[in-house]
Amino acid sequence: MSHDQRSPSEEVSRTALSKPASESTIVGDGHHPLPAKDTSTRAWLVVVGGLLIYFPTFGFLNAFGTFQTFYVQDLLAGTSSSKIAWIGSLQIFLLFIGGLVVGPLYDKVGATKLLVPGSVVYVVALMLTSVCKKYYQLILAQGILFGCANALLFYPTIAAINQWFDRRRGIALGLAVSGSSLGGIFWTEIIQLMLDHIGFGWTVRACGFISLAFLVPSCVLIITRPPEPGESKDMQLDFKAIFTDTKYLLFSVGMLLVLWGMFIPFFYLPSYGETYGMSVTGANNLLAYMNAGSFVGRVLTGLMADRLGRFNVISLAALSCGILLFCLHKITTSGAIIAFSTLYGICSGGLISLQSACIGQITPDHSIIGVKIGLMMGFCSVGGLTGSPIAGALLSADHQKWYGFIDFCGSILMGGAVVTILSRYVAAPREWKF
């Protein structure tokens, strides 16, 4: 079937996010043909840049459990784990809600003008974090400023990859976002090692210097793709149409529930391991196992999504995460906890990378994909902000017994899976591959 003969539900989105004239690295004017989507070297260089971005940004966030344990036991000893979890939750909240601003900004100014200041703010946030001694200081530096920096880096990257890929969008996004899993493995190990040998301040400063080595080349590799001939250069926003699109609203609610619970194990699994007799080092390594599984999951779900349907795969991933979390009631030995962390990483791997691909698939007007991704992530920010503190409060209320914690996490992920499946049915009730 030719490209022009595809049905709307089969048509993989071609985004028309505009590129300003001032950012004309590549010109699509008829005299300088645009590099091909999916296959050109230029397109895959954007993916490489995305991997380099997500290694220090999302990867560092995936290692927050190491900081959580250190703050509870050392720097902020005496402060409840629920209160400390707000630091990591603020990062997620600002990363998500930042899409309301950064998404439309990307449509107007392109990638470079967001990635460069985002990189500067990222490094400054870590340098300020390195001198923090009190809780409120960490909230401001590691929570708020670092979260804003992540938003400036996350959305231009994921929007640019959506522009450069069509048929292979799933695997392209999976490969790029797998950088966060590789980063999670690296940061989990190196942070704990440095904390043991050089202390908190120089550990965080060293993280800033290492991150800079990844951020600089990514700012060069990631560029906005100009619109193709015939594509709209201006956003045609109709908020009434967006907010009355049933399949989009259902998918957004599903992702809110999924992201409400998905990040909680990344914050608390080391503490869970210590509860059941694992050493501090062994418990911290659970994050490395989880991120290793996440790397496999992101690549695997990207490949599966392009072949079996993106909504099908993301729904299956969310359902699997919920089932695994309920299994924690019976998982109390070191070997079983390690197996859980790896499997959870695999199943949760595609939940971030496939979101934008799903939005693109149900967006007929490709000039507003960036806005719709930003609106959805802004909506999901509520879950990112409150999920871990609520789970921590349940843990404290149960006197460090994990029953309520597990039931909360598992229930909201299962609920998110059900709503996501419903959105898939509304979007394409008669097609198996969607």
From Swiss-Prot:
Gene induction: Expression is positively regulated by the cluster-specific transcription factor pynR.
Which Gene Ontology BP annotations are present? secondary metabolic process
Tell where it localizes.
Cell membrane
Instruction: Please note every region of biased composition (Basic and acidic residues).
Output: 1-13
InterPro entries attached to this UniProt entry: MFS (IPR011701), MFS_dom (IPR020846), MFS_trans_sf (IPR036259), Proton-linked_MCT (IPR050327)
Question: What's the chief localization of this chain?
Answer: membrane
Q: Which Gene3D superfamilies match?
A: MFS general substrate transporter like domains
Which topology term describes how it sits in the membrane?
Multi-pass membrane protein
Source superkingdom: Eukaryota
Q: Which UniProt keywords apply?
A: Cell membrane, Membrane, Transmembrane, Transmembrane helix, Transport
GO CC, alphabetical? plasma membrane
Which residue spans traverse the membrane?
Answer: 44-64, 84-104, 109-129, 138-158, 171-191, 203-223, 249-269, 280-302, 311-331, 334-354, 375-395, 402-422
Which stretches does the entry tag as region Disordered? 1-34
Q: Which GO terms describe its molecular function?
A: transmembrane transporter activity
Note whether Hydrolase occurs among the keywords: no
What function does the entry list?
A: MFS-type transporter; part of the gene cluster that mediates the biosynthesis of pyranonigrins, a family of antioxidative compounds. May be involved in the secretion of pyranonigrins.
Q: Which family does it belong to?
A: Belongs to the major facilitator superfamily. Monocarboxylate porter (TC 2.A.1.13) family.
Protein's name according to its UniProt entry: MFS-type transporter pynF
Q: What is the lineage of its organism?
A: Eukaryota, Fungi, Dikarya, Ascomycota, Pezizomycotina
